[in-house]
Amino acid sequence: MALTYVFRSIRTEFSKVCTVHHAQSLHTGFPTLAAEKALLMKLRKSTGYTFINCKKALEKCDNDITKAESWLHEQAQKEGWSKASKLEGRRAKEGLIGLFVGDKAAVMVEVNCETDFVARNEKFQQLVKDVAFATMAHHSSKNQGQTGYVKSLLAAEDLSKLNLGEDASLADQLALTIGRLGENISVRRAVTVGVPAGWHIGSYIHGGVAGQSDMAMGRYGALVVFQGGKDGALDTLGRKLGQHVVGEAPVSLGNMDDLPCGDAETRLLPQSFLPDPSRTVAQYLTEQGARVLDFVRFQCGEAGSDGAH
């Protein structure tokens, strides 16, 4: 009886010790798990990569979130370049025209993808912005101190050499986006214009993307360089001229005294003015005291054209 009592007492005390130890282990483990989950959520939010890849990155980098983010970008870039080479031959005729007008300078770009679904994706639209602002930065750097009119057309090869920052190239960003979206994407062309004092830049985008505040995007775009116009009405004049160029698709400028050739007219100035077909573009400009000097029109996916005339 005495021995039985002793064994029971030992067993009871041992159970208490195990229970306390287990509870302490759980208590000390909770903060660690919570911290790891918080890191995982933060990395997922900042990069947009899957939870599985984010978890793998944190494990490889000993929960160093900065190193994990760099590792994820490196892997995505490698996968993007690989996927880009595989998708290169696929037809990409959808996409967006991006247009930004700054102080005496403007840029218009075309970025193509395979489907309208991807064109509506935020990551694709961010790429359009990256291309436009990189092109504008290139224009500003190249034309410092320029006092006259400057116009530059950039093809895909020129654009691929541009940088987004000190450590990022446009070509790498393109590969990264292809890897994320899984479609063939191409940065097709861009145009920049810079104007001197007294000149103005009108613009218009058709089929616009909602929710864009820092630049305009759509299926069609136009830039119009003009002089003159009435004070307080320059923005309206520029927008109407851009709207006409998008809608009527002129291929050359023409002269103010050219006679119109009807519906087949391809010269801008003798065309019937789209917002008011009762007069020609030349007649409208005369009434406004203005003169068009140049224009560029982009249509997303159009064949064999750089938009110049």
Swiss-Prot record:
GO terms for biological process: mitochondrial translational elongation. InterPro entries: EF-Ts_dimer_sf, Transl_elong_EFTs/EF1B, Transl_elong_EFTs/EF1B_dimer, Transl_elong_Ts_CS, UBA-like_sf. One of its GO terms (molecular function) is translation elongation factor activity. GO terms for cellular component: mitochondrion. The keyword Mitochondrion applies. It comes from the Eukaryota. Keywords: Elongation factor, Mitochondrion, Protein biosynthesis. It is found in: Mitochondrion. SUPFAM superfamilies: Elongation factor Ts (EF-Ts), dimerisation domain, UBA-like. The keyword Ribosomal protein does not apply. Pfam families: EF-Ts_N (PF25025), EF_TS (PF00889). This protein may be expected to contain an N-terminal transit peptide but none has been predicted. NCBIfam families: tsf (TIGR00116). Belongs to the EF-Ts family. HAMAP family: EF_Ts. Associates with the EF-Tu.GDP complex and induces the exchange of GDP to GTP. It remains bound to the aminoacyl-tRNA.EF-Tu.GTP complex up to the GTP hydrolysis stage on the ribosome. This is Elongation factor Ts, mitochondrial. The lineage of its organism: Eukaryota, Metazoa, Chordata, Craniata, Vertebrata.
